[in-house]
């Protein structure tokens, strides 16, 4: 009798994706982050669902409802901090996952990569709208500053901003619609992640060497299921350590003050995972230029596959490209630090130099270095 998991219409989809999937025998722990992102998404959807049962999306009661969740709901504090810090873990995994893709040339799978870029945009939009919901000072002013950037779009800008606000400022209508979008987007993300996997399984996984692994495949289960479980346990360990020991470590103290349109906080800044993009935005003195640079800082990922000039796929055997990759990582960390600093000397000039270096590395220096490496190997 044929095994049910191979014949049942639903089971065979699961089987071909997670059980009998032929996987390269040499993929390292850097390939764990896809499954970790799936776990993060599930955690966020579940905790978010329970938070939504007690949250009210009204400007008068939003802040109080979050306080009520933390004080009066059974384990409400746990659910709330799991959700807030779960977002941070989500972005850590996301950045590492993208970094892996850049290092090992996984971006050569065009459809998978482009859906990944789309997923990054969707997750960033969801996180931004979620940050507005507690209706603290940083929620309100963050929403005001970021939505206001759209007014830089020529001709339609100011109308567009008022349309998004649903009025003449960030108010009840804005909060209500942000809650609605924040609720629906994770399900769209889950669907996109399914398509992401679908395209990945068309080609099979890449591997650290960047060479074809068709001749050397092993079944996903039990080898990589057990490896993924280890990753998940480590993720939960870090997440629970954050939630139970220092839940506010990555948050902003200003968000414990209810939103007040008449009082601007001294330093308006987004959550830590947006700081690199915020630094790039601030480093250009022109409003429209800043908005374009902000969009391009993420969109530049979509161009990466077309700038691949090396004859080798992975950076595993390319020491010069490796150096540049780690310079790019250091540059992004510098931008993240600058994004959290006030707009004054010397932070402004450091931010501008780091922003220029970011675009130069990806668009110019790395492709030229790859050609140089080809030359060294007389290819």
UniProtKB/Swiss-Prot annotation:
InterPro entries: Cyt_b/b6_C, Cyt_b/b6_C_sf, Cyt_b/b6_N, Cytb/b6-like_sf, Cytochrome_b, Cytochrome_b_C_euk/bac, Cytochrome_b_N_euk/bac, Di-haem_cyt_TM. One of its GO terms (biological process) is mitochondrial electron transport, ubiquinol to cytochrome c. Its cofactor is heme b. The keyword Transmembrane applies. GO terms for cellular component: mitochondrial inner membrane; respiratory chain complex III. Its main location: mitochondrion. It is a multi-pass membrane protein. GO terms for molecular function: metal ion binding; ubiquinol-cytochrome-c reductase activity. SUPFAM superfamilies: a domain/subunit of cytochrome bc1 complex (Ubiquinol-cytochrome c reductase), Transmembrane di-heme cytochromes. Heme b b566 binds at residues 97, 196. It comes from the Eukaryota. Binds 2 heme b groups non-covalently. The chain crosses the membrane at residues 33-53, 77-98, 113-133, 178-198, 226-246, 288-308, 320-340, 347-367. Heme b b562 binds at residues 83, 182. A ubiquinone binds at residue 201. The keyword Cell membrane does not apply. Pfam families: Cytochrom_B_C (PF00032), Cytochrome_B (PF00033). Component of the ubiquinol-cytochrome c reductase complex (complex III or cytochrome b-c1 complex) that is part of the mitochondrial respiratory chain. The b-c1 complex mediates electron transfer from ubiquinol to cytochrome c. Contributes to the generation of a proton gradient across the mitochondrial membrane that is then used for ATP synthesis. Heme 1 (or BL or b562) is low-potential and absorbs at about 562 nm, and heme 2 (or BH or b566) is high-potential and absorbs at about 566 nm. PANTHER family: CYTOCHROME B. The cytochrome bc1 complex contains 11 subunits: 3 respiratory subunits (MT-CYB, CYC1 and UQCRFS1), 2 core proteins (UQCRC1 and UQCRC2) and 6 low-molecular weight proteins (UQCRH/QCR6, UQCRB/QCR7, UQCRQ/QCR8, UQCR10/QCR9, UQCR11/QCR10 and a cleavage product of UQCRFS1). This cytochrome bc1 complex then forms a dimer. This is Cytochrome b.
């Amino acid at each position: 009798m044929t095994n049910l998991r191979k014949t049942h219409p639903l089971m065979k989809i699961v089987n071909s994706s997670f059980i009998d999937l032929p996987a390269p025998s040499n993929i390292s722990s850097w390939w764990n982050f896809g499954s970790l992102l799936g776990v993060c998404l599930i955690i966020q959807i579940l905790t978010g669902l329970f938070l939504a049962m007690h949250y009210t999306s009204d400007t008068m009661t939003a802040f109080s409802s979050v306080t009520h969740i933390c004080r009066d709901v059974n384990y409400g504090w746990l659910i709330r901090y799991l959700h807030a810090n779960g977002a941070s873990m989500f972005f850590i995994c996301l950045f590492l996952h993208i970094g892996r893709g850049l290092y090992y040339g996984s971006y050569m799978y065009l459809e998978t990569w482009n859906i990944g870029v789309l997923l990054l945009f969707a997750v960033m939009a969801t996180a931004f709208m979620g940050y507005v919901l507690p209706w603290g000072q940083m929620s309100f002013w963050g929403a005001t500053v970021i939505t206001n950037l759209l007014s830089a779009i020529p001709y339609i800008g100011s109308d567009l901003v008022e349309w998004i606000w649903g009025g003449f400022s960030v108010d009840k209508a804005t909060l209500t619609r942000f809650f609605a979008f924040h609720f629906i987007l994770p399900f769209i993300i889950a669907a996109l992640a399914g398509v992401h996997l679908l395209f990945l399984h068309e080609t099979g996984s890449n591997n650290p060497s960047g060479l074809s692994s068709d001749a050397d495949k092993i079944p996903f289960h039990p080898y990589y299921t057990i490896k993924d479980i280890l990753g998940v346990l480590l993720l939960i360990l870090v997440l629970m350590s954050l939630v139970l020991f220092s839940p506010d470590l990555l948050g902003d103290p200003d968000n414990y003050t209810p939103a007040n349109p008449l009082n601007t906080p001294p330093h308006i800044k987004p959550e830590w995972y947006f700081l690199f993009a915020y630094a790039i935005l601030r480093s250009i003195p022109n409003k429209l230029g800043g908005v374009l640079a902000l969009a391009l800082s993420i969109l530049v990922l979509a161009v990466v596959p077309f700038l691949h000039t090396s004859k080798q796929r992975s950076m595993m055997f390319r020491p010069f490209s490796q150096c540049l990759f780690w310079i790019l990582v250091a540059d992004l960390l510098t931008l993240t630090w600058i994004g959290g600093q006030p707009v004054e000397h010397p932070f402004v000039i450091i931010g501008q130099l780091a922003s220029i270096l970011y675009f130069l590395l990806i668009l110019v220096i790395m492709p030229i270095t790859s050609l140089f490496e080809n030359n060294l190997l007389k290819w």
